[in-house]
Amino acid sequence: MNLFVLMKRTFDTEEKIVIETGKIQDDGAEWIINPYDEYAIEEAIQLKEKHGGTITAVTVGGEEAEKELRTALAMGCDQAVLINIEDDLDEPDQYSISQVLYHYMKDQEFDLILGGNVAIDGGSGQVAPRLAELLDIPCITTITKLEINGTDAEAERDVEGDVEKIKTTLPLLVTAQQGLNEPRYPSLPGIMKAKKKPLEELELDDLDLDEEDAEPKLKTIERFLPPKKEAGKLLQGEPAEQAKELVSLLRSEAKVI
């Protein structure tokens, strides 16, 4: 099987986030593989172990993403591709990234493309479905189980707590939801082997893609942190009195009714 994994380098949202002049200050930030993409990587590795094949990890970004690609190689991917847009696109959006990926993937032979359900830094979940639409292939999002039998595929996907079962055929694009598997940690031998595995760097010119054709369609007006949570209030008295006070607070302070 020819397996491709869409991977994104993100900052760890568990760390403190600083916003200045409308931009996230990433100096000193901890950068990681998007956690949902780790599920995709692990699923690709398990499929390769079962069916054989080659796994290619692909990311769009700057040169700094090489570190995360090497981590993917250490986990078990066979090769990696960095599509460097650092000097070409300023603040690319989901349209931009999907266009870049499409111009790369359309020339590749693939059976299955895997990606994370969402990126923890943006959370739109748009890139993979957009790419599938451009490639004109089936797309199943938020999968929690995947079985491949020849050119047939069966998947279970999370639907707000329920499960939906879907059958389709390859080639296919899927996005991974938490619970699909338990991503492995890179082993020491894996880390050593990753240093020698091929990592190709491409630019838009290599894809015959003009900057104008991948210009973002969205413009960010403002970025801000959510308000700090205030201490809760403990309501006293009988249930009827508590209910009355709660309604009053919702109207006067929360202003939701």
UniProtKB/Swiss-Prot annotation:
Cofactor: FAD; AMP
SMART domains per UniProt: ETF (SM00893)
Pfam families referenced in this protein's UniProt entry, alphabetically: ETF (PF01012)
Cofactor note: Binds 1 FAD per dimer.
UniProt-listed Gene3D superfamilies: HUPs
Keywords: Electron transport, FAD, Flavoprotein, Transport
InterPro entries referenced in this protein's UniProt entry, alphabetically: ET-Flavoprotein_bsu_CS, ETF_a/b_N, ETF_b, ETF_beta_N, Rossmann-like_a/b/a_fold
GO molecular function, one term: electron transfer activity
CDD domains: ETF_beta
Subunit structure as annotated in this protein's UniProt entry: Heterodimer of an alpha and a beta subunit.
Biological function: The electron transfer flavoprotein serves as a specific electron acceptor for other dehydrogenases. It transfers the electrons to the main respiratory chain via ETF-ubiquinone oxidoreductase (ETF dehydrogenase).
Family, as annotated: Belongs to the ETF beta-subunit/FixA family.
Protein's name according to its UniProt entry: Electron transfer flavoprotein subunit beta
Lineage, top ranks: Bacteria, Bacillati, Bacillota, Bacilli, Bacillales
Gene name, Swiss-Prot/TrEMBL: etfB
